[in-house]
Amino acid sequence: LSDDARARIVRCREYLDRKMENPERPIYGITTGFGSLCDISVGSDELSRLQQNLVMSHACGTGERVPSEIVRLILLLKIQSLAYGHSGVQLATVERLVEFFNRGILPVVYQQGSLGASGDLAPLAHMSLPLLGLGEVEYKGEVRPSAEVLAELGLEPIRLQSKEGLALLNGTQFMSAYGVWSLIHARRLSEWADHIGALSLDAFDGRIEPFCDEVHLIRA
């Protein structure tokens, strides 16, 4: 993270903390429940637990595991999003995601089960579980409990602060990662297709006149 990104993250978190100093003004999903429970107040001693429960309750993915290269892209895109300083997360949470990315600690995410209402909720919940010492990660080619890997590396689980569960789960990093991956491969395939086509034309002793610029200018 750059110094500017760190400053933005800290500044946004401080702003949120100031807004929460007024208990008379409820803030959706922070001092209230979610969805139909939006009129239920949440006490200050339960704010962290609310966010942790949000992550755990949405970690309901099924199917095959998401490939490792896609998970790395998910982490990168989530880090980029949070680094803009608009999400209200604590700096430690973003730094831990950066550490996961740099050390190759890849959360186990599943391909099916996303709710999709506010983004890729289920996949991003699975991405977030290892921050709490929950779920599984792929580390050095092995799938292991995240708590075990964190302990091995001397890392303590993150204690989510108010709003952090929302910030981690809301977003489109899962589908965006697949989109980026597909675009990269499409560009490579496009280049290969040109080379393969040229070699095939040469192998069959084809004529190159149909490819001249002048021909296509006339046809246009």
Which role fits each region the language model picked out?
Residues 1-220:
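Conserved, well-structured ligand/cofactor-binding cores
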